[in-house]
């Protein structure tokens, strides 16, 4: 529906639900907004988190708690940035998808949360903010993001620089692969009726052009078409 970014106190923002990130140890993430809620919830919040027991990375769950100014408190397992080759970007996107889906299933119309993984999990901040805003645009509720630093607030208002294609790697099956300038790879669907693009951290040798003598090379015009699909994608 809509989103906005603010630096207000997260507890002062009217919303049906709030969402927090959790570390793999099920501790509340160390960001200022997360800790603000943790301090307000006190031992009751810590007990509610323990009752949840475990949340897989990228998933979300509700913590049953009435001591906060929200009807629902949602938790999600935040990913850490390791080396960019462990599906970190995909997992972070799943965090938002899971949180928004759970909030909608609970009947929420509004949600407040910090930017996940953007401060203490070594994520590239620009990418973390971009994923948050892109997923919020698709959500069926009003989302308020609390930017815990001036840098995050500034990034939320800047155009996102899409990673540029460095080279065409090859294709396998229904997908072509392009190397990006951030060390990741863009996989683009070859089928004309589809315009699907996904970013992946690695590629298998089968994608390398010329490694399969039975696989014909793609015409330059087709490679150019696939490149345009990537450049025009979200």
PLM region descriptions:
Residues 80-162:
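Phosphate/ribose-phosphate-bearing ligand recognition and processing surfaces
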Residues 185-192, 217:
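Short amphipathic beta-strand/extended segments with alternating polar/hydrophobic composition
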């Amino acid at each position: 529906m809509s989103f906005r970014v603010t630096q207000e106190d997260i507890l002062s923002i009217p919303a049906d639900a709030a969402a927090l990130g959790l570390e793999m140890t099920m501790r509340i993430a160390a960001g200022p907004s997360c800790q603000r809620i943790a301090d307000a919830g006190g031992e009751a919040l810590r007990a509610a988190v323990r009752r949840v027991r475990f949340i897989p990375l990228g998933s979300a769950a509700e913590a049953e708690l009435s001591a906060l100014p929200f009807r629902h408190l949602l938790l999600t397992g935040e990913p850490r940035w390791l080396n960019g080759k462990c599906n970190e970007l995909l997992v972070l996107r799943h965090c938002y998808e899971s949180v928004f889906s759970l909030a909608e299933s609970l009947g929420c119309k509004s949600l407040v949360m910090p930017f996940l993984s953007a401060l203490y999990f070594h994520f590239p901040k620009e990418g973390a903010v971009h994923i948050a805003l892109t997923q919020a645009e698709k959500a069926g509720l009003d989302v308020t993001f609390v930017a815990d630093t001036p840098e995050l607030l500034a990034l939320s208002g800047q155009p996102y620089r899409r990673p540029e294609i460095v080279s065409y790697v090859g294709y396998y099956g229904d997908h072509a692969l392009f190397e990006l300038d951030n060390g990741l790879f863009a996989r683009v669907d070859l089928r004309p009726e589809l315009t699907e693009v996904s970013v992946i951290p690695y590629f298998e040798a089968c994608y390398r052009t010329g490694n399969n003598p039975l696989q014909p090379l793609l015409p330059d015009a087709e490679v150019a078409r696939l490149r345009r699909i990537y450049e025009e994608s979200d």
